[in-house]
Regions:
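Charge-dense, helix-prone N-terminal extensions
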Residues: 2-144
Length: 144
């Protein structure tokens, strides 16, 4: 394997253990779309749906890929959400998720953060997800 492939810089990104794409750090829509395109199997379709819901809900959302995960935020207010692929699900992290109503279902080691996991056969409640995104975008974000 060439060095650029190991580093995720070739035409086909490397999948890290658990299936998360290795995408170089970058700001804007392009690196996030590269991440979504590199999500394995069914996860790419869900990633596109999540990204579209986020864009519709927060029209001027700022995007970046950091630590091999897409981040979504508000300029000058920090990041409110990130995505990460695992073997059997996509983890959506709401950095101020404990303040959302209803609270996203999965707890975190961080008191403020809550997660929402989406598996291959799960039904995505788009209205609930959009409601969480809207609420999260109005809270102070994380400066990561």
């Amino acid at each position: 394997m060439a060095a650029d492939e190991r580093l995720g810089m070739g035409d086909k990104p490397v999948l890290l253990p658990g299936g998360n794409p290795q995408i170089a750090k970058g700001y804007g829509d392009a690196p996030v779309q590269a991440y979504i395109a590199a999500m394995p199997g069914w996860k790419s379709d869900i990633g596109r749906r999540l990204d579209a819901i986020i864009e519709r809900t927060v029209p001027n959302v700022h995007k970046a890929v950091k630590w091999n995960s897409p981040f979504y935020g508000i300029e000058g207010q920090g990041w409110f959400l990130s995505l990460h692929c695992f073997a059997n699900y996509i983890k959506v992290a709401f950095f101020r998720g404990a303040a959302l109503r209803p609270v996203p279902p999965v707890a975190s080691k961080s008191q403020d953060t809550r997660y929402f996991h989406i598996g291959e056969h799960d039904t995505l409640d788009e209205a609930q997800f959009a409601a969480w995104v809207k609420q999260a975008s109005r809270l102070p974000g994380e400066d990561l």
